[in-house]
Amino acid sequence: MTIHTTTAGRTAAPAGAAAAAPAGTPAGAPAGAEAGAAAGAAAGAPRAVRSRGALRLGLLTAPVAVLLALLSLLHLLQGTSELSPAEVWQALTGTLTGSTAEASAVIIDARLPRLFAGLAVGAALGLSGGILQSITRNSLASPDTLGVNAGAYFALTAVAAFGVSLPFFSSAGVAFAGGLLAAGLVIGLSTGPHSSPIRMVLAGSVIALGLAALTSMLLLFFPWQTQGLFAWGAGSLSQAGIQGVITLLPVLASAAAALLLFGRRLDALQLGDDAATSLGVRVRAWQAVFLVIAVVCTAVAVTIAGPVGFVGLCAPALTRLLVGFFPGLTRQRSLIVVSALLGAFLVIGADVLMRALLGSQNGVSVPTGVVTSIIGAVFLATLACTARSGFDSDSLVTMRAGTGFGLRHPVLLITICAGLLMAVIAGSVLVGDAMLLGGDVVNWLTDQASVRIEIILETRVPRVFAAVLGGLSLALAGAILQGVTRNPLADPGVLGISAAAATGAVAAIVITGTTSFWAILCAALTGASAVGLVLFGISARTGLDHARMVLAGISISAAAAALTTLMLVHTDPWNQTKAMTWLAGSTYGATAVECLPMIIAIVVTGAVLSAVSRDLDLVQMDDTTPQVLGVHVGRTRSVLVACALVLVAAATISVGTIAFLGLVAPHAARLLIGRTHRHLLPLTGLLGALLLTIADAIGRTVIAPSQIPAGLITAVIGCPYFIWLLWRMRRS
């Protein structure tokens, strides 16, 4: 503080102190009185600022609260029973009598629990998303993108699968443990000196994919114990009563109170680690505290309604967009309150919209999370285009490629891999729920086998060849996409192309009722092509880098999965289980007819690739070099992408959606033989066929007679590899 002194050596009042004195102060009043008046005015200034901030917050929250109340009343009017607004009001006030008294039971036992569940889930996810975005200083962070929802859902499914019956409150504890472990793993893997928003979200999204694969395994292995969890897993507000919601409301209220109480610490964390430490805040300890609170909120939401997608991303992000109009939202207490209100508004609004579009009867069976996932996927893709990624643009070219042996003897290495594939095919034919001998196969080929052996091999051999052809197709598609986009993270599954193909196939079956294999194939190709055009069109116009393109693909996968769920919940349980098995990536039920499209696709695209392999070598470098050497980059890229889409559609219709295979196989081939596509593509195809054939054999054998879809095994293998690849690619 600067001290002003007079020439007589006395301490003078700070400049302007007299002006700060209240009106009416006598001119001859002592200097101490003037100083006291100035201090009082200075102390009153922060109170005035806080009052104005509270007023602005009230002006914002009041309209949102009013709209939420009106939306809640509209929500109560929707349902399978036709009730007038007057009857709803009388039921709420307890004035219904006589023959109309049953309307009161409808409101109290069915509609109010659904409404309260939506309000609680939306508020909980809004709170959780706001906290996660604040402590990570990452606008893309949410319970979905950090794997918290997936961890909580997996934990609850595991408990149900093994027959453990828990009270509602204890289930929330299980969800909390699963969500906390997932969030801790994501944050531990993605933080550090080279962290970035995209890195963290990619790590969380891929871990969520891995956990989803494990959850799908449990749903398939224990269909009776986990009955009803499929629709619930997409985020369903259907409730058996209001007691479960009431049980968890104190937990949610306690978490919200803790956030309001410690809001100043959360404000300090926004200043950065160094600034917060200088203010006396123990950064790591308080980040851990707030992480626990966020996971508690998510656990409450997942226990009530399952993982409702992307509400925790959209609500805080929408709140931050209002900061320009309401500066008080920079305070975490204000942001948390508004995020909770907007979260509840989004969930109730999605439920109202869904039942308005689909009708009350169908709206009850469709999970609300389907609508929020579609909206949130668009939101995530939009945010991904503006976020900092932290990845180099030329990381595919600069990554290590080729071994000494592979570079010197590429043809010999390809021959060895082909021989290994033949051996694996022979072994795969022999293993499964019934072990066979080589003589059994010989007898079958010469029409001398028993009826039992004929039945086994007539179903097993097409499966083996479907795995070989599917792995070869997806691996080639992955190598093409990585070369065309110069993106080491590119994969048909990760980019959403496989999910879109599956959505197209399911739409053809459910909507049109067709059973024609070729019609379903055309629908799958249409879905894959639509996503490919959108993804690569946006990339060409906006210059998406590696990580942003992958994140956009993940958001497309989420939207496609939501649409697929929307269609599947209307099918019977038998077809639902069959569809889940196929969507998980299984060769179950494959026939020779289903292998034919893959054979055609491989032959045609193989001929094209052999002609343009040199051009692909140049395209993977940059855009300038191939143009200088006379290569038409746009035309070459279009032809190659078309080849990849055809391969993905043919493989998806035969073996379902299989993620990470198109990522792992090209990288393994590149490490062995180098970047020259004349040798890289054949080896990639062989390695892809090898991997999927082994995965299929493992899935048919380890828990026989039950089976694990091959796609789930490749997901469990590919998820750690993707995380390792992210770690290698961080900016140095």
Feature-to-residue mapping (PLM):
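Alpha-helical transmembrane segments in inner-membrane proteins
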Residues: 2-16, 20-25, 40-732
